[in-house]
Amino acid sequence: MTTILTLGGGGHTMPHVHELPTSPLDELALSLTGRSRPAVCYVGTAGGDEPGPALRFREAFADVARPSVLTLFGRDEPGTYGPDAIGPGDLERILEQDLVYVGGGSTANLLALWRLHGLDRLLRTAAAHGTVLVGVSAGGNCWYEGSSTGSFGT
C-alpha cells in the first residue's frame, strides 16, 4: 500500500507558528512510518535545492529521526546537506528511506529533473515497498497524475 501525505504548508517549514520542537504535522508524518526513529529524506528539487529549507529539515528531525537530504543540483554548502547527503551519483539510497519529504517550488522543474535523473522511477519503487511520501505545495503535487501549478506563470 502506498501512503501519501500532502500539505499546503506548516510543519517544520513554519516553526514560528507551532513553537514546538516537532510540529504536529511532522509527528503525524513520522507516525505513518511505524518506526521509532525512521530514516527520513528531504528533497528540495522544486526550490532549486536551496540550503535554508534543507537545514531547517535536518534541524527539525535530528532528535526524532535519521534525516538526510537529497540534492540534484550538486550544491555543496558546508554543513547544510550533512554527512549523509544523497547526490546524483547515489540516488538508489532513496530506497533505504522510511519517509521522503519533498519541499515546494516549481512543480514543472521538479518533474523534469526527476525524470532526467530517473528519480521518479526510484520513488515509485520506494513507495511500492512502503516508503511514506510527504510533500508540501509542489512537493505534494508531484505525487499525483495531475495538479494545478503556478510553474508556467498566471
Walk through the language-model features, giving the residues of each.
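Extended, subdomain-level signal for the structured scaffold at the beginning of enzyme domains
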Residues: M1-A108
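Class I SAM-dependent methyltransferase SAM-binding "motif I" and its flanking Rossmann-like core
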Residues: G103, L111-T154
